[in-house]
C-alpha cells in the first residue's frame, strides 16, 4: 500500500458497513458505536468508512433506514396468508419480535419520519399499503387507518422500548402483558368499522 493512501477492502460496500454497524448496535447499544470501532471490526482504517458513509450521523440514519426495511420485510411476510384482524395482529407481532431481537437497530428506528424526504418515504411504502389494505377490508376509513397507524406505532415502539430497557420490573410475564395489550388495542379497532 502506498504511504498516505487508504486502500478499500475487497467486497466492502455500504451494505456491509451498515450490517456490521447493526450487529455492533444490537450488541453494545447504538450510543456506544464509534467510527473507529466500526472500522476496526471491518479490518479497515477509519478514513475508508467515508467511501460509504458521511459520518456518524449518516451512519445512524442508514441504520434507521436499514431497520425499517428489515421490519417491513418481516411484517409483510407475517401478513401473507392472513386477513382482517389476524393480519393486523400478525404485523404487530412481527414488529415486536424484530424490535426486541434487535434493540440497537430499533433505537435508531425510533425517530423515523416517513415524510422527511423521498428516501424515507419509500422505505415503508409497502408496509403502509398493506396496512391500508387490511383496514379497508375491515371497512375502516383511510383517515382512521392513519390514526390507527400512529396509535399502534406509539404502542409498539413504547412497549418495545420498555422491554429493551428492562423497565418492566414486576414478575408477571412481559409476553402475557403484550398479548393482553394487543388484544385490547385490536378490540378498540373494531369500534372504527364503518367509520
Predicted features by range, described:
Residues 1-28, 32, 36, 58:
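Basic, helix-initiating cap at the start of DNA-binding domains
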Residues 16-23, 27, 41, 58-78, ...:
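Alpha-helical structural segments
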Residues 96-117, 159-169:
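Amphipathic alpha-helical segments used for helix-helix packing
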Residues 50-54:
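Base-recognition residues in the alpha-helical recognition helix of bacterial helix-turn-helix
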Residues 108, 154-171, 186-195:
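Amphipathic C-terminal alpha-helical segment
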Residues 114-151, 176-187:
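Amphipathic alpha-helical packing segments from all-alpha helical-bundle domains
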Residues 33-40, 49:
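Append "Primarily bacterial transcriptional regulators
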Residues 76-104, 142, 149-152:
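Hydrophobic alpha-helical connector segments
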Amino acid at each position: 500500500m502506498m504511504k498516505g493512501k487508504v486502500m478499500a477492502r475487497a467486497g466492502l460496500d455500504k451494505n456491509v458497513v451498515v450490517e456490521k454497524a447493526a450487529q455492533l448496535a444490537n450488541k453494545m447499544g447504538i450510543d456506544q458505536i464509534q467510527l473507529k470501532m466500526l472500522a476496526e471490526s471491518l479490518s479497515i482504517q477509519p478514513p475508508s468508512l467515508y467511501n460509504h458513509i458521511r459520518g456518524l450521523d449518516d451512519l445512524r440514519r442508514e441504520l434507521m433506514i436499514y431497520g425499517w426495511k428489515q421490519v417491513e420485510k418481516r411484517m409483510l411476510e407475517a401478513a401473507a396468508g392472513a386477513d382482517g384482524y389476524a393480519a393486523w395482529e400478525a404485523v404487530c407481532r412481527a414488529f415486536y419480535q424484530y424490535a426486541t431481537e434487535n434493540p440497537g437497530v430499533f433505537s435508531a428506528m425510533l425517530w423515523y419520519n416517513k415524510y422527511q424526504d423521498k428516501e424515507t418515504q419509500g422505505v415503508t411504502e409497502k408496509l403502509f399499503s398493506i396496512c391500508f389494505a387490511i383496514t379497508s377490508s375491515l371497512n375502516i376509513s383511510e383517515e382512521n387507518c392513519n390514526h390507527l397507524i400512529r396509535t399502534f406505532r406509539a404502542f409498539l415502539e413504547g412497549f418495545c422500548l420498555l422491554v429493551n430497557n428492562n423497565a418492566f420490573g414486576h414478575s408477571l410475564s412481559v409476553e402475557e402483558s403484550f398479548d393482553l395489550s394487543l388484544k385490547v388495542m385490536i378490540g378498540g379497532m373494531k369500534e372504527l368499522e364503518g367509520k
